[in-house]
């Protein structure tokens, strides 16, 4: 349960196994990692430096506004697979992403499963991205990704709904709604992109709605 403290999930180096840490429980071996519950202060960290990590989000609700960091952070070059079960909500803190991953991320779910990832609004800077990842693959479920609104700083923009920093965004099935955050009142403040990719974009199925945020008044 996320309300019991920050959760860290690491690839154990053995296929199909993770090690999970929370509070006084350190590196507990687990073959079916399910994260559930509600918290306004605790976050999830996933470490794929030793291999791939599979987790299930079961009606998970995290609002990291008080922490000023991503609700879920992923380190390492391995792949993280998130299986959705029920309705899940991840909100990043000030200027931070809902989900921030430097490696590859895979999201899957059924028709009635969903993930809403929101970037935090920037106080005097840019808003956070809903989902920021090196690469992202979506196999099903409903994924709502909303960029955070920009603050009042100059040259600051709204966050992207989905931002791919290096590789690819691939959508096979499901419904994806991506909306950029709005620009602020500072000079040269633009709205964020619904989807922003520095790599390739491939859509072979499902429904995709991408909307950019409004530009600011400066």
What residues fall within each predicted segment?
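A composition-driven surface/loop motif
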Residues: 1-218
């Amino acid at each position: 349960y996320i309300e019991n403290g920050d959760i860290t999930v690491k690839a154990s180096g053995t296929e199909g196994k993770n090690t999970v840490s929370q509070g006084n429980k350190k590196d507990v071996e687990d073959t079916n990692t399910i994260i559930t519950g509600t918290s306004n202060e605790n976050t999830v960290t996933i470490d794929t430096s030793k291999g791939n990590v599979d987790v299930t989000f079961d009606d998970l609700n995290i609002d990291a506004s008080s922490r000023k960091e991503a609700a879920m952070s992923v380190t390492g070059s391995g792949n993280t697979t998130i299986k959705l079960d029920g309705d899940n909500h991840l909100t990043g803190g000030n200027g931070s992403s809902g989900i921030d991953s430097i490696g590859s991320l895979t999201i899957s779910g059924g028709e009635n499963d969903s993930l809403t990832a929101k970037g935090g609004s920037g106080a005097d800077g840019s808003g956070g991205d809903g989902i920021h990842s090196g690469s992202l693959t979506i196999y099903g479920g409903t994924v709502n990704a909303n960029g955070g609104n920009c603050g009042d700083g100059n040259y600051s923009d709204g966050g992207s709904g989905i931002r791919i920093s290096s590789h690819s965004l691939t959508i096979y099935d499901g419904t994806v709604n991506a909306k950029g955050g709005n620009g602020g009142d500072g000079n040269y403040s633009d709205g964020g992109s619904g989807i922003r990719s520095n790599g390739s974009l491939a859509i072979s199925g499902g429904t995709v709605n991408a909307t950019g945020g409004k530009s600011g008044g400066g």
